[in-house]
UniProtKB/Swiss-Prot annotation:
The keyword Lipid biosynthesis does not apply. Belongs to the TRAPP small subunits family. BET3 subfamily. It is found in: Golgi apparatus; Endoplasmic reticulum. Part of the multisubunit TRAPP (transport protein particle) complex composed of bet3, bet5, trs20, trs23, trs31, trs33, trs65, trs85, trs120 and trs130. It comes from the Eukaryota. This is Transport protein particle subunit trs31. One of its GO terms (cellular component) is nuclear envelope. GO terms for biological process: endoplasmic reticulum to Golgi vesicle-mediated transport; intra-Golgi vesicle-mediated transport; intracellular protein transport; macroautophagy. TRAPP plays a key role in the late stages of endoplasmic reticulum to Golgi traffic.
Amino acid sequence: MQSTNKELFRSSVSESLKSTAPLMGKSVYEQNLNKIRNSDVNLSSFAFIFSELIQRIQSQVSGIQEFEEKLNEHGYRVGQKLVELVVWRERNPKRETRILGILQYIHSSVWKYLFGKHADSLEKSKEASDEYMIVDNNPLLNKFISVPKEMNQLNCCAYLAGIIEGFLDSAQFPCKASAHSVPLSQYPYRTVILIKLDPSVIAREEVLG
């Protein structure tokens, strides 16, 4: 069964690897951080690495909740470093102090930085003043992963939720972020990243007016 699941995870990645040429030239470690500002990661390379991460976590966990928690932890570390990198590359970095400002920045600039496009929408919860939602109709992280039947409730965008949580925590907007599948007929992988802000953030926002 473990072998079959690994093949399921690999199958869609293999097709991508066949059709995309490998990276050429210098290693990313040899390049100047500013000179590669507009460079893209080879899609097949990313798909392969992410698939390997999924398989590694799968061998360590016993259920979907634990699986998504592990994905979130890995993404969180990326989000922490992403703040530093974005600030380093910004020509005129601005520190966001308001909730809407930082979330709009993530919805547009950070999403484009990560995936080459803006997120599809940013929404505020009508039920809770401390909750916001970022929606991606066709998330890249779910595109190359075929989930086994017994894990059909798994959403690999838990990794993305971790990135957002790490980014916001490092930007002094502590929160909890989670990924939720909300499919539509035309968008079967549609995912909502639910962001629940820490009470201290809400209190600060009220002071700022």
